[in-house]
Amino acid sequence: MKTKAGFVALIGKPNAGKSTLLNTLLNAHLALVSHKANATRKLMKCIVPFKDKEGYESQIIFLDTPGLHHQEKLLNQCMLSQALKAMGDAELCVFLASVHDDLKGYEEFLNLCQKPHILALSKIDTATHKQVLQKLQEYQQYASQFLSLIPLSAKKSQNLNALLECISEHLSPSAWLFEKDLMSDEKMRDIYKEIIRESLFCFLSDEIPYESDVIIDKFIEEECIDKVYAHIIVEKESQKKIVIGKNGVNIKRIGTNARLKMQEVGEKKVFLNLQVIAQKSWSKEEKSLQKLGYIYQRNRD
């Protein structure tokens, strides 16, 4: 069997549709999806098998990254550093740009990325044919920069094979790097954590999802059931009250939604215990971010 394998960084502005694209390619719910920008905070490896037209069985390891953005908040700097690290580690990049975005995000990416890349135009199902053609024409001024320009829709599964074919074409022959049926090298407890975070984005509004995170205190994995004990961390006591809700209605909704998704992903029953704590300025403190597993490289210049 002829095989290829390689790491591909998936880069884009917040809400470009990176996580939706990966979940569609995997046919599974692993990456956090929200209509709110900047939902993804940590790099995740997602492994997509693909047989290309040359007969190679390719193992494409996508590095799902936080959206490219610049803010002074320490947490946001951590997120940006992960996207930059992914670009450095990958042999190929895919820049995902919404058909509704201007070209500024792509121009910023060009200044940051030194690797060969494919430009993918996402969400074409939400635009008219004329709008898609116009946006493709706008990007043609950078034709010498990208390997290929591919319009696609993850929601409608349009042109996804074309994207995978193009990626496989630019990977080198190699033995597979992971087991055949593995979709991610993430531990189940980390996937469960992201599912809880996604539920926060689903049921909470305004700034609360951005000023919250999840810590798995205890994870017990048994044959027929996973037991998850976690707490949601917020910045203020007032936010804690909102997360819990009157008579606990909000935390029950969040917990039920998360538990059902966990059971779908884990293919077994899940017991979920959620608590809420308030810790002032956790997203601005390096010690707190280290505890939560975010990578941060301080600029010492």
From Swiss-Prot:
UniProt subcellular location: Cytoplasm; Cell inner membrane
Name of the protein in question: GTPase Era
Domain Era-type G residues, every copy: 4-173
Gene Ontology BP terms: ribosomal small subunit assembly
Positions bound to GTP: 12-19, 64-68, 122-125
UniProt keyword rRNA-binding present: yes
Region of interest (G3), ranges: 64-67
SUPFAM superfamilies associated with the record: P-loop containing nucleoside triphosphate hydrolases (SSF52540), Prokaryotic type KH domain (KH-domain type II) (SSF54814)
Organism domain of life: Bacteria
UniProt keyword list: Cell inner membrane, Cell membrane, Cytoplasm, GTP-binding, Membrane, Nucleotide-binding, Ribosome biogenesis, RNA-binding, rRNA-binding
Annotated stretches, region: G4: 122-125
The family this protein is said to belong to: Belongs to the TRAFAC class TrmE-Era-EngA-EngB-Septin-like GTPase superfamily. Era GTPase family.
Organism in which the protein naturally occurs: Helicobacter acinonychis (strain Sheeba)
